[in-house]
Amino acid sequence: MKDLSRISVVLPSLDPDEKLNAVIDGLLEYGFTDIILVNDGSRAENLHYFTDAAAAHPEIHFLQHEVNRGKGAALKTAFTWFLANRPDGLGVITVDGDNQHHPADTRACCERMLETGHIVLGCRDFTLDNVPARSRFGNHVTSVVFRIFVGMTVSDTQTGLRAIPRDALEILTAVKGDRFEYETNMLLAMKDNGLPFEEVKIRTVYIEENASSHFHPIRDSWRIYKLILAHFFRYTLSSLTSALVDTAAFSLLGWVLRHWMEGFALTAAAGVGARIISSQLNFFLNKKLVFRSHASTGRAMLRYYCLAIPQMCIQVLLTQGVYALLHIADSQYVLRTLIYAVVMAVLYVVSYMIQQCWVFAPRKRGSQTQGVKS
């Protein structure tokens, strides 16, 4: 068993009950010696759970917010305190105060982090019978959306059990968000900064149908999905802008070049010229505004054109194939342009996923393992 003396447990809580004592007792029993307990503006009648625990256990350092600021703010308060006051600390592990994280799983996540130096997510199994239907459905949808629109495979996007090494913590403390959306922003920041992570399977515990959770299904879900879909929304705007430029250039070049070319040659020349113009605009919009990538411009541009050139060829061939199939004449400029735009729209979703996962992906800070350790 590994020494956990240089690992701090971050334990945020709002209006706790007696389960908080059980959480603390379990952590101490499993070898944790430093607990950062954060009161996130609890009501007066619940304060004694914090003060009693802090008085009874010298292993606890007690922090508090005068008013409720949200789970994200509570986590960042603890992270900031850890970085300033635990210079020899190797990392932290975040734990929820409702006793739904078994201390054995908490320890397992920490030991895995110490072995690999990676962020470790303790992930529940949502296929089990004891999982509430709304939790099973919500996590499944969020995981699918995350995989498609963010390019990350995370089986439990809302897990509160996260072991974070010190170097990653310095990055994640600066992430925006004060409430439940902070944990989603944390995952997005892990992707943007190339922070390696992996999953460890943990017990799936729901007490009283998760009644003690402070998660607001509509309000907090909206905050989370807004963050996840932001990349794709910006990509759509970038694509529409580039598509308008591309389509206008294709139409103009086709009108000009029709005096010297016809058939496939006309389609190819107009398509290539339009794509050269629009691709430069699209590259810089995507790099700076959509993916906000810090990847090397030269490397990203090389990858971008390794994608864009085959895509352009496929687009031209598909467009010309539709023209031939439907017997569209060279003089039917409006219809030709419409077909070209439709083909371009069909290809852009696949292009988005490749750009996100490869073209503008940051260099990883080590081997990223998204597998599951039992």
Residue ranges and their predicted role:
Residues 39-50, 67, 99-100:
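A conserved acidic beta->alpha catalytic loop
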Residues 1-3, 175-258, 275-279, 286-310, ...:
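Hydrophobic helical membrane-anchoring modules
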Residues 51-87:
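Conserved donor nucleotide-binding strand/loop of the catalytic core
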Residues 6-8, 34, 185:
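Cell-envelope/extracellular polymer assembly enzymes that use nucleotide-activated donors
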Residues 15-29, 45:
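Short, well-formed alpha-helical segments that are part of the catalytic scaffolds
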Residues 67, 73-82, 103-180, 207-215, ...:
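Acceptor/aglycone-binding surface of glycosyltransferases and processive sugar-polymer synthases
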Residues 15, 40-42, 69, 78:
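Conserved short acidic donor-positioning loop in nucleotide-sugar-dependent glycosyltransferases
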Residues 88-100:
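Short beta-strand-to-loop acidic/aromatic patch adjacent to the donor-nucleotide binding site
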